[in-house]
């Protein structure tokens, strides 16, 4: 039986503030090989959840550059994991952070936005890190930004992900300090 705990938006935001403009040495920098955006957002969400799902192919985890789930670093796979697409949910048992598609008005700092081109291909993942005078501010890697207005991105399509909680098999110790300081991956 799974237990549910709240997602810690504040921890995700603190992590983003610390690492948006630099790199945590615990994680490979994918900027030169497809982009580091989804990895960075995954790191932020991990800081706010401390739960990974180690199911090969359909999980959400990072141990090393060669031992990671596609959802930790891939835009579409990230969305499918978090929105619990049936194939993912059947394969991975639902452990880990989860969310749902949301409107712009429903998201808050700590939630996620993804950008698509005119053909509808989603290519960029960003963390919402603030709201100022009604404007969503985002942080991301690849082109490193912290609190950049979302309106400055020229993307024909956007989709929003509201992170609703974290499913776990038992009590989870905090991972924040080791992750935030770049000293230790959770459960490693």
Predicted features, each with a name:
Residues 1-76:
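N-terminal capping segments
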Residues 118, 150-151:
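Short, exposed beta-strand-loop hairpins at the edges of beta-sheets
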Residues 62-138:
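...with weaker cross-activation on analogous glycine-rich loops/strands in unrelated enzymes
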Residues 54-57, 125, 150:
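Short, solvent-exposed loop/turn and secondary-structure capping segments
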Residues 31-33, 58, 73, 92-98, ...:
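Feature targets compositionally biased, intrinsically disordered low-complexity regions
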Residues 137, 141-142, 151-188:
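Low-complexity, Gly/Ser/Thr/Pro-rich intrinsically disordered linker/tail segments
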